[in-house]
Amino acid sequence: MPLENFGSVLNFAEELETQDQLFYATVAANPACAEHKELFEQFAADAKKNIKTAQRTRRENVTEMILEPIKDFVRAPFCEECAGADSMSAEDALATARRLQERAVNYYTRAAEKIKALPEVSRALKTMGKKHNVQREKLAVL
């Protein structure tokens, strides 16, 4: 499904963050992942903040929206299933978390490029991408 405008880019960002929040909250409660519970709880809290950031960005910039469509940007490369988080081993949960962080960094980087016409929105997307990059680096050392 194509991401054709400002609203669809931010709506999809909100969907990704909601999926991430659910995944991290679920693996934080998974006894097999107890060793990384604090990290996953922090990631869930960060995802919740990112949802609010996406919503606020959409709300504050809707009047500046440019109707020019976004081209060549689709959801497919950023869709990832996270089923079974409640029964994953710690190793599988960390591997999935790494994939989710990589996906988020890629999405926010590409989205910021595609929405350059709205500098405030592009900046917000870049900032969210940087936050995910920090999380990705935390996961890389585990």
Where are these regions (language model features)?
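Domain-length accessory/inserted modules outside core catalytic folds
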Residues: 3-5, 53-57, 61-64, 91-94, ...
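Alpha-helical transition-metal enzyme core signature, strongest for iron centers
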Residues: 13-24, 40-58, 101-104, 125-139
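Short loop-to-helix capping motifs
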Residues: 33-34, 117-118
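Carboxylate-rich helix-loop segments that flank metal/cofactor sites and access channels
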Residues: 56-90
